[in-house]
């Protein structure tokens, strides 16, 4: 199916090439800026036909063959590299548009634009003076009588007013007093009472120990006396029994 399409493609390409060559020749003939236009103006002469034919032949020779197009081995990059680069674009015979090139900025202008304007320090001497000025202590003015039983203290970091309470006082304004159950005299009396109780208890214990010792000694002596009496009675009974046997 591809073989009948090749001659059609070739004929179409030839027609396109011929038309483009003819259009380019007409543009060059009508261009007023070129010197060749004056000599080739008017009707198409034989030389003009030869020029157009020569250009058509050159363009035909530059176009790839049908076999290269069918195989796809043709490199289009070489064709585009060989073409001369045009600085402008031709829209019409009487109008020609050229590329606009922006002027380059000087280095001095670029450096000036990059440099930022220096900011002026606000305040100057007055600003330094304001910083050096200390804030007023509110304890001397607003919170002078804030603490009832204590001293007012102002913490600058936290900006808080606190009270340093006196002894036995507490609370936010040191208005509450802690009530003690025992005084110092009571403490001394309690100590004396504890000492007296310990002495009394120790005396009772010693007395009990002494009484116990006395009772044990008395009981021991009594038991010993009873034991001696029993032994004497046994001796007497033995002696009496011995005399009775002797008489008998």
Curated annotation (Swiss-Prot):
GO molecular function: cytokine activity; epidermal growth factor receptor binding; growth factor activity; receptor ligand activity; transmembrane receptor protein tyrosine kinase activator activity
Chief localisation class: membrane
UniProt entry keywords in alphabetical sequence: Cytokine, Disulfide bond, EGF-like domain, Glycoprotein, Growth factor, Membrane, Signal, Transmembrane, Transmembrane helix
Biased composition (Basic residues): 117-136
GO cellular component: cell surface; cytoplasm; extracellular space; membrane; nucleus
Propeptide section residues: 27-99
Keyword Metal-binding: no
Subcellular location: Membrane
GO annotation, biological process: dichotomous subdivision of terminal units involved in mammary gland duct morphogenesis; epidermal growth factor receptor signaling pathway; epithelial cell proliferation involved in mammary gland duct elongation; ERBB2-EGFR signaling pathway; G protein-coupled receptor signaling pathway; glial cell proliferation; mammary gland alveolus development; mammary gland branching involved in thelarche
Disulfide bonds: 139-152, 147-163, 165-174
Residues making up the signal peptide according to the UniProt record: 1-26
Compositionally biased spans, kind Basic and acidic residues: 100-116
Regions that span the bilayer: 192-215
Carbohydrate-modified residues: 106, 241
Keyword Glycoprotein attributed: yes
Positions of the UniProt region annotated as Disordered: 29-48, 57-77, 100-136
EGF-like domain residues: 135-175
Topology class, membrane: Single-pass membrane protein
Protein task: Ligand of the EGF receptor/EGFR. Autocrine growth factor as well as a mitogen for a broad range of target cells including astrocytes, Schwann cells and fibroblasts.
Protein's recorded name: Amphiregulin
The species this protein was found in: Mus musculus
Gene: Areg
